[in-house]
């Protein structure tokens, strides 16, 4: 049917795939600032169509808005009417006409001419039906955006929030920079990188797991407030909280510390919530729209030490037990799965993640973790077994780590060499040499943008806030199958 109409359009001398069409306003803007009697040119996809024989009401729009249109057989020439009758829901059109209000008060464009911009050869989906179609939504995001206004709203929200984050930081004197995605040494985090090879240079490279070491080079070079908002890549698991490529903000403030950055993150998140979510209470709903949890971002946010939180769930004597005793308690009393290959601090971290982090929904700054967990942070002066850091937990997951950055090159060398016992880690000796030129004391933060938007948008999966999440390839079928 659609291909038959395509052929007929061509017979009429109409290019079914259009070309340039100058507009006076977008559909949503035209409706928002509506006035009667205006001559307008507006373009969009036909989203709804009600044919009444000699006339038709229709809706055209895009991801940012829509407006109603009207066309009457007696109000256009014969050729325009014939072209109109060859159009379907899903086609892209340009409309030239005049604005008016219907008897029901609906802003409408009375079409005088119609320009075909693209004849769609496949129909639009009607709607999605719950969980049965979730994976199809992720694989064919274009159809999800067409059928689901809520999905479109989330991605518009994401775009506006990212713009607001940049403005917030620029307003505090931070300069945005770009650092390499392809790196000789994958540093700045404990994660397994994706590996590739540069043929012209004859050398292996990795996709970056973090920009941290390059941003610190800029502190050495004289930047005092610097940030990067870009992609990182980690060759690790996929879950509702993890995607192999993800958007990350990292920012560094010379002469600050982890407390400086904690205050700034609290300001930033509350600013986003008040600007885009209508307040500091964020409802999270199930598939039926029932509120299952409300996250309260009211200030001041809770602060607690890592040690106190772990002892609170694992026992006041947890840190007095030997490694065998801690392992036994995990298996016999706490129900926390651990492996024999885990180091002692990794066992404690597993307890923290399962019994504290995953059950903490309102904001909590967790401070002063064990030094082996964060080799790039400054040691605590009172207890060098700990580092001066925070981990911000909201909605059962880490949203942002913040550090007092380590700037002693000798200590940094020792700690990175100790960490490199993990086969995924290599020591970036060029970075250590850079530190020898002098890096000012600084506070640093990372914010997982995808997780932050999940929390603020009330989304249950990272796939709901990433336009094209990574999915396992299906064994057969065409693109997107």
Regions found by a protein language model. Name each.
Residues 1-481:
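Class II aminoacyl-tRNA synthetase catalytic cores and aaRS-like
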């Amino acid at each position: 049917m659609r291909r038959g109409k395509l052929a007929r359009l061509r017979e009429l001398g109409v290019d079914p795939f259009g070309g340039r069409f100058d507009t006076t306003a977008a559909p949503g803007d035209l409706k928002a600032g509506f006035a009667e009697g205006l001559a307008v040119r507006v373009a969009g996809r036909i989203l709804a169509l009600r044919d009444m024989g000699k006339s038709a009401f229709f809706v055209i729009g895009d991801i940012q808005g829509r407006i109603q249109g009207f066309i009457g057989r007696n109000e256009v020439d014969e050729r325009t009417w014939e072209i109109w009758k060859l159009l379907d829901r899903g086609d892209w059109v340009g409309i030239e006409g005049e604005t008016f209000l219907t008897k029901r008060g609906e802003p409408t464009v009375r079409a005088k001419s119609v320009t075909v911009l693209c004849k769609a050869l496949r129909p639009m989906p009607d709607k999605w039906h719950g969980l049965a179609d979730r994976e199809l939504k992720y694989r064919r995001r274009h159809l999800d955006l067409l059928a689901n206004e809520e999905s479109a709203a989330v991605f518009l929200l994401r775009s506006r929030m990212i713009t607001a984050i940049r403005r917030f930081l620029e307003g505090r004197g931070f300069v945005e920079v770009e650092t390499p995605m392809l790196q000789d040494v994958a540093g700045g985090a404990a994660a397994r990188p994706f590996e590739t090879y540069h043929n012209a240079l004859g050398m292996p490279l990795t996709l970056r797991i973090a920009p941290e070491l390059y941003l610190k080079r800029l502190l050495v070079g004289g930047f005092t407030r610097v940030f990067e908002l870009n992609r990182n890549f980690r060759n690790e698991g996929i879950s509702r909280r993890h995607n192999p490529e993800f958007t990350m903000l990292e920012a560094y403030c010379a002469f600050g510390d982890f407390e400086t950055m904690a205050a700034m993150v609290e300001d930033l998140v509350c600013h986003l919530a008040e600007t885009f979510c209508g307040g500091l209470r964020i409802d999270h709903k199930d598939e039926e729209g029932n509120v299952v949890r409300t996250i309260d971002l009211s200030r001041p946010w809770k602060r607690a030490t890592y040690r106190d939180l772990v002892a609170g769930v694992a026992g006041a004597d947890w840190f007095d037990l030997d490694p065998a005793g801690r392992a036994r308690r995990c298996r016999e009393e706490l129900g926390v799965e651990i492996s024999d290959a885990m180091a002692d601090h990794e066992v404690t971290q597993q307890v923290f993640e399962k019994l504290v982090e995953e059950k903490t929904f309102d904001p909590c700054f967790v401070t002063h973790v064990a030094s082996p967990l964060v080799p790039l942070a400054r040691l605590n002066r009172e207890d060098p077994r700990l580092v001066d850091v925070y981990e911000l937990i909201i909605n059962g997951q880490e949203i942002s780590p913040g550090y007092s950055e380590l700037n002693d090159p000798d200590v940094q060398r020792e700690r990175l060499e100790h960490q490199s016992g993990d086969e995924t880690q290599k020591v970036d000796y060029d970075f250590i040499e850079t530190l020898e030129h002098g890096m000012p004391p600084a506070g640093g933060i990372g914010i997982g943008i995808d997780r932050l938007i999940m929390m603020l948008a009330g989304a249950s999966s990272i796939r709901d806030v990433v336009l094209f999440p990574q999915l396992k390839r299906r064994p057969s079928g065409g693109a997107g199958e």
